[in-house]
Structure formats: structure tokens, C-alpha cells
Amino acid sequence: GKLLAVDPHRIRSYSKRRMRERVEKGGSRPVKMAQTFWVLDADTHQPVCFTTATTARSVVDVTPELMDLAESILQPAPGQALVVADSEHFSGELIEDIHQRTGFDLLVPIPNRPVHRKSYRQIPEDQFTRRWAGFATAKVPYTMKRGGKYFQFVERTGERLDDFRYQGFLSTTDRDEVDALTSDFPKRWHVEEFFNANQSMGWRRGGTQNLNIRYAQMTTALIAQAAIHQLRAHLEEPFSDWDASHLAKDLFFRIDGDVRVSGDTIVVTYYNAPNAERLRSRYEKLPEKLLKESVQPEVPWLYNYKLDFRFR
């Protein structure tokens, strides 16, 4: 939990409820959207928490609640965790709130507007440090009108004055800007990889805006995602690289098996699972293995039956 990525993920909603419509892509017509907001561990590529909201609520409205949830889970010490976000989170009110009230540091791109591009060109040349061919960085103080005093990291690409291109980032703390810009921030794209690989399990579309139903449906999908993530770790290529749809179609739907009850244990037997030896070493005699890890093997939502597997 030392590097986190926060990102909104909006999906088409088919709710009958009257709600504000939203244009998600340029050139498309407004449609009903269900909003979800996520925090992912950018190193493990796995979700920490999420929340959902109607299109009436903005990123500025929802993100403080989301970060409170992440803080209650991770309980980071000040300066221990860095949150990377997109330019939609560039708000003085939001940045100040997270900086002052939580233990998270924040790194946010500054929107590519003319006023900002002009300010980058006015930075003296001696404040830029050439890192390698075509890449230089500068670290300068930055004050927001509705926020506090922070740091602005500016990256400059190009070798000649006519070719210079700039991109600015706001950091709530003084840190190494090269690591932040070339190592930390690019990991934010793991959020998109997570959505692309797993959204078929429950967050590709929304059929209702009832919050109880939405939270239950998405939470159940995340339980499935966590189980499949562990399964991928025990499958060799190409299975380990397949997205959720591919796994469902060409792995799960093609496995034969049966389910039996033996005493207080539900036994699931698979007959043609790939990498059976690796799966057998991990999942057979599962109740005994859980007890060795001080985990109770009874499953509450299976009427406290234990769950075990066999591979033939």
C-alpha cells in the first residue's frame, strides 16, 4: 500500500430512474452513467476499495469519502503512501482536504491549459536539470488559490527550444521528481489494465441505480476477482494472461466436474483442469491447510460447510 492509484470508472446505466446524463467520449451523445470510484494498489495491481455514486456527484465530492475508506483500511503513517491521480482530481479544495486530513501524499497532473503552458516556458533555464537526452525536469514552489503551498514538478521533453514540450504535476510533498515522474506516476495505468481485464465480472454495465443492489453486486464480483487472481498465480501461460471473459469461455466453461457432500465438507472434483498438479498442491485438503494458517475453514455463506477440491 505504498503506491496507490485513484480513478473513476464510469459505465453505461440502464436504470429506469431519471438521472443526469453524461458525455463520456467526445462526439457521442449523453447517456445515463453509473459512476464507480476506485483505489488500487499500483504495485500489486489489486483493488483496495471502491464506492459508487450517481452522475450528480463529481470527483471532488466523492474522492474524500473514498480516501477516508482507504485510510481506514491501510492506516498509513504520514508520508508512507503516495496517491497518483489524473487531472480530473486537480482541485484546490480536494487536494487541500486530502493533504491536511489524511496520511496520504498526492501526485496529480496539472491540466494542459494555456496559462499553465505559459508558466512552464517562463521557468528559468537554470532551474531545469537535464536527466538524459531529450528529458529535463524542474521542481518549483506552487501555490493554489484555494489550497496551500505545494511543489510543482515540470518535465520538459525535446532537445531544441522549438521542440520543447512541457507537462506539469502537483505534489503535496517534496520528493524526488525523477522517480515520481518516471517510475511512480506511470504505474497509474495499471488501473486501466485492471478494468480491461476484469470488468466483465461486474462493472461493465449497470442495470439499476439502487445502491444496495449495486454494492452487493460489485462486492460479489470483487470476491470472484480475488479468487481468480489467486488462481492465475497457479496457472502457467497462456491462462495466467487471459482476461475474465477469456477465462470464462475457454477455461471455466470447459472444465468438467461434480459436487458432493462428505460429512461437513463440500467436495468439488475437477476432471480436466489445466496444470492439475500445481492446483492439487494448492487446493486439495484445503481445510487442513487453512487450519495450519490459523484460518477457520468453515464458510459462513455455505451454512458453515467446509470446502475442498479434487483434481482427476
Question: Predicted regions: what is each one?
Answer:
Residues G26-Q75:
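Electropositive, glycine- and tryptophan-enriched low-complexity nucleic-acid-binding patches
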Residues A133-F135, A224-R312:
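A short, flexible helix-boundary coil/loop motif
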Residues R12-Y14, R57-S58, H89-E93, P114-R117, ...:
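Flexible loop/turn segments at secondary-structure boundaries
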Residues K2-I11, H45, Q80-F90, L106, ...:
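Short, conserved catalytic/metal-binding motifs centered on acidic residues
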Residues R57-V115:
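Domain-level cores of phosphate- or acyl-group-handling catalytic modules
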Residues G1-L40:
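Active-site-proximal, Lys/Arg-enriched surface segment
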Residues E177-D184, S200-Y215, R232-D243:
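Short, solvent-exposed helix-loop connector elements
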Residues E96, Q100-S200, E288-R312:
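An anionic, glycine-rich sequence signature occurring as long contiguous blocks
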